[in-house]
């Protein structure tokens, strides 16, 4: 018979189990109060998601729990002395992925993930009351509301899976189900409600059923899960889950935040003096404030993984995804050449572009390959082509375009904070590129430094957990004990002058100049044709 570890049998210690449920892999760590990772396991998914139709992205929620158990089992095999002495556990998950459950809290279908591109058209916006339509038009948010609603899966489920919709009792953010599997409590952290839900981030609660945002998302109010404030306890590990996972029975599951919020905290960004830039498939820029401020008009800031703080975030949906797009379409020869040299194609391309002057000889790219909330009709654009440009200029222009878009995001945030960050902290896979890091420093004209760990999200979640347990009094104390600062990269101010001119005279004028063209051409785009 398998031995069941019990929380009360374990001596108090300063270890936390941190579970990072990602899109491509699941990582489990044991982290101590100094920020040191004592044991680590990563489970790379054989199939991150499946698509029953082109553009769909779904996954069975049980899949993630199976991967979690594999990871914690490996931790137990590697270093049982740590897992058996944890003081608690925290979980963080990717955002904006939904699940519907029946009366018995069982999934009715796979979860629809944030990568999913299905759209449900309703040109008349019939989900809104007549006065709401007038209101949204008056405040200039009609297109943004329509964009949000079309990508809210409730409408698709009602239209194409009515039988499942009629059986639905609970409509929940995906982390809710994970919490239920671990503790038996169908609850979700207020830090895990980013997405297409009627959530009031300022007050940390669901909007009432009478609020216009409830009409936009069309989720029955009675179907939404109970909420737990960040830092509070969601529940304790059940005996059933302990048997499968080797996590001690009674271990407290602490409510934290989403992946990006935890990553920002793990970067050490806790006030408006620092900005966190995450360079991944999607790129984000975050600034943390103790007061609720919307980063862009009518778009919310998110709850930080500790109390009384908010993340003002602007996202570039197609961030370093652009590099993969470039290589898939134009990089065949470069991939071959890099293989001959025994280096990655990214290293090879960085060598090719490092001597191209700042501004790519006047080639400017706007990375709207994926639509944004504020500009739902925008598309990607490249201007300035001439005979001097090569494919390497285009590659560098992608880097610069991402940096321009992030700077534009920071400009929007600074309109609310009225403060320019003293430093920018870089994390994510793209931060490994020296060329990209220097471009960002030069575009912003602000010193930058890299996060000390590739697992900044796990570190941030652990810090939030230690604050909850009382190991640290507040976020400032946690950062001082657990986050290290790396070498500072200073901007080249001559390059900054070049980028400043391009940014103000070209980049910022591209969308206003092309907005009418985008509207006229939308019937020719594959993803909007027939609207």
Q: What does each of the following model-derived ranges do?
A:
Residues 67-71, 263, 401, 405-409:
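Well-ordered alpha-helical segments embedded in enzymatic catalytic cores
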Residues 61-64, 68, 149-150, 234, ...:
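Conserved donor sugar-nucleotide recognition element shared by glycan-biosynthetic enzymes
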Residues 42-84:
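N-terminal phosphate-binding loop and adjacent alpha-helix
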Residues 5-44, 87-125, 239, 287-299, ...:
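Glycine/Thr-rich phosphate-binding loops that ligate phosphate moieties of nucleotide
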């Amino acid at each position: 018979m398998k031995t069941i570890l019990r929380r009360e049998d374990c001596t108090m210690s300063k270890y936390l189990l941190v579970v990072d449920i990602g899109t491509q892999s699941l990582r489990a760590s044991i982290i101590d109060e100094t920020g040191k990772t004592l044991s680590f396991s990563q489970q790379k998914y054989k199939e991150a998601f499946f698509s029953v139709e082109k553009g769909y992205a779904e996954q069975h929620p049980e899949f993630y729990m199976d991967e979690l158990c594999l990871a914690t089992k490996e931790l137990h095999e590697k270093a049982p002395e740590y897992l058996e002495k944890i003081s608690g556990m925290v979980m963080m998950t990717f955002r904006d992925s939904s699940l519907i459950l029946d009366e018995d809290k069982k999934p009715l279908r796979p979860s629809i993930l944030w990568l999913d591109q299905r759209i449900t058209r309703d040109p008349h916006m019939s989900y809104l009351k007549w006065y709401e339509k007038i209101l949204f038009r008056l405040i200039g948010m009609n297109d943004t509301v329509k964009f949000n609603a079309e990508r809210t899966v409730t409408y698709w489920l009602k239209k194409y899976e009515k039988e499942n919709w009629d059986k639905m009792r609970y409509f929940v953010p995906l982390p809710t189900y994970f919490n239920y599997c671990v503790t038996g409590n169908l609850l979700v952290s207020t830090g895990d409600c980013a997405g297409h839900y009627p959530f009031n981030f300022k007050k940390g609660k669901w909007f009432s059923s009478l609020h216009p945002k409830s009409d936009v998302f069309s989720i029955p109010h009675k179907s939404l899960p109970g909420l737990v404030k960040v830092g509070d306890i969601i529940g304790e590990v059940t005996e059933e889950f302990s048997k499968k996972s080797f996590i001690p029975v009674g271990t407290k599951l602490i409510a934290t935040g989403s992946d990006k919020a935890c990553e920002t905290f793990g970067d050490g960004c806790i006030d408006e003096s620092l900005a966190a830039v995450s360079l991944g498939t999607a790129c984000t820029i975050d600034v943390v404030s103790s007061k609720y401020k919307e980063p862009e008009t009518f778009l919310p800031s998110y709850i930080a993984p500790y109390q009384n703080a908010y993340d003002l975030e602007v996202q570039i949906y197609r961030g370093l995804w652009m590099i993969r797009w470039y290589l898939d379409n134009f990089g065949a020869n470069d991939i071959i050449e890099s293989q001959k040299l025994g280096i990655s194609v990214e290293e090879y391309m960085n060598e090719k572009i490092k001597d191209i002057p700042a501004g790519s000889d006047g080639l400017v790219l706007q990375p709207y390959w994926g639509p944004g909330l504020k500009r739902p009709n925008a598309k990607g654009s490249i201007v300035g082509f001439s005979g001097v440009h090569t494919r390497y200029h285009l590659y560098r222009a992608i880097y610069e375009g991402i940096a321009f878009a992030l700077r534009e995001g920071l400009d929007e945030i600074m309109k609310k904070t009225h403060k320019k960050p003293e430093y920018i902290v870089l994390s994510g896979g793209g931060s490994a590129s020296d060329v990209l890091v220097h471009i960002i420093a030069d575009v912003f004209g602000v010193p930058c430094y890299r996060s000390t760990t590739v697992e900044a999200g796990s570190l941030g979640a652990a810090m939030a957990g230690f604050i909850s347990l009382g190991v640290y009094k507040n976020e400032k104390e946690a950062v001082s004990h657990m986050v290290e600062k790396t070498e500072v990269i200073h901007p080249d101010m001559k390059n900054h002058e070049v980028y400043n001119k391009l940014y103000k005279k070209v980049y910022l004028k591209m969308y206003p100049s092309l907005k009418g063209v985008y509207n006229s051409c939308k019937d020719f785009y594959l993803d909007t044709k027939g609207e």
